[in-house]
Design a protein with these regions (language model features):
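NAD(P)H-binding glycine-rich loop region in Rossmannoid oxidoreductase-like domains
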Residues: 1-12
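Short acidic donor-binding/metal-coordinating loop in glycosyltransferase active sites
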Residues: 4, 34, 77, 138
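Active-site YXXXK catalytic motif of short-chain dehydrogenase/reductase
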Residues: 11, 58-62, 76
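Conserved active-site helix of classical SDR/Rossmann-fold NAD(P)-dependent CH-OH oxidoreductases
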Residues: 15-16, 63-67, 120
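Conserved Rossmann-fold NAD(P)-dependent oxidoreductase catalytic core, especially the SDR/UDP-sugar
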Residues: 16-53
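Structural signature of the Rossmann-like NAD(P)-dependent dehydrogenase/reductase core
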Residues: 30-33, 73-74, 111, 135
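NAD(P)-dependent short-chain dehydrogenase/reductase
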Residues: 55, 67-112, 116-117, 123-124
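Mid/C-terminal beta-alpha module of Rossmann-like enzyme folds, strongest
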Residues: 121-173, 202-215
Length: 215
């Protein structure tokens, strides 16, 4: 949102350029989009055909960049997971870098998946004839307070999470196509398996070791 011109180029123009290159190579493009294409004002979870009513430059540019046709695939979701860069900025990295206590918003609703699950879905999509638009979710939702509590539980991080009832946009979404041949697990299972994966690959995620009680 700080650089709308750059956002339009990267989020809106570039995916379509990639699509053209994929067409030339007779290949399928798998593009990742976001729940931020929605404003969060709908009273029920968003489905694939809902109007993309996000208002800011990021939302509009991501919406324009979605590739929805019979040859390519857009996976619309939201993700949480560890980052390779030390100055990460997403929720998991932010939480793991905090000390003392943090706020957890009980009315900030989330329907996404871990980066580990998204990788599994992408791997599956490469091998299967699935195209168009697909919502990657377990068709449930969780509030950000409960999500942080799960991360605390499985990392054994010494931190207090204060529940805060602050009204937030509800961008929850569901998958109405149901074409995956495996079940996306519960949030507790997703977080547990993600932390297990990190412990099995400590050399990659060593930046998080000092912020976790699990070694």
């Amino acid at each position: 949102n700080l650089d709308p011109e750059n956002a339009i180029f990267i989020n809106a123009y570039f995916p379509h350029r990639l699509m053209s290159l994929a067409d030339e190579l007779n290949s399928k493009l798998i593009h990742i989009s976001t729940d931020c294409v929605f404003s969060g004002t709908k009273e029920m979870p968003y489905i694939e055909k809902d109007f993309k009513d996000g208002k800011d430059a990021y939302a509009k540019s991501k919406g324009l960049g979605e590739i929805i046709n019979k040859n390519h695939l857009t996976l619309r979701t939201s993700v949480i997971g560890p980052e390779l860069k030390r100055d990460g900025e997403e929720l998991f990295h932010w939480f793991m870098s905090q000390t003392g206590q943090v706020n957890g918003f009980t009315q900030a609703i989330w329907s996404g998946v871990t980066t580990l699950i998204l990788a599994k879905v992408v791997d599956w999509a490469i091998e299967h004839e699935i195209t168009g638009l697909y919502h990657v979710t377990n068709n449930n939702s969780i509030d950000k307070y409960s999500l942080l509590c799960l991360i605390k539980k499985y990392t054994k991080k010494n931190i207090s999470i204060i529940p805060v009832e602050d009204k937030k946009p509800n961008k929850s979404f569901i998958d109405t196509r149901n074409e995956l041949d495996f079940i996306i697990p519960s949030y507790e299972v997703m977080i547990r398996k993600m932390i297990d994966m990190m412990l099995q690959n400590k050399e990659i995620y060593e930046q998080y070791e000092s912020n976790s009680a699990r070694k």
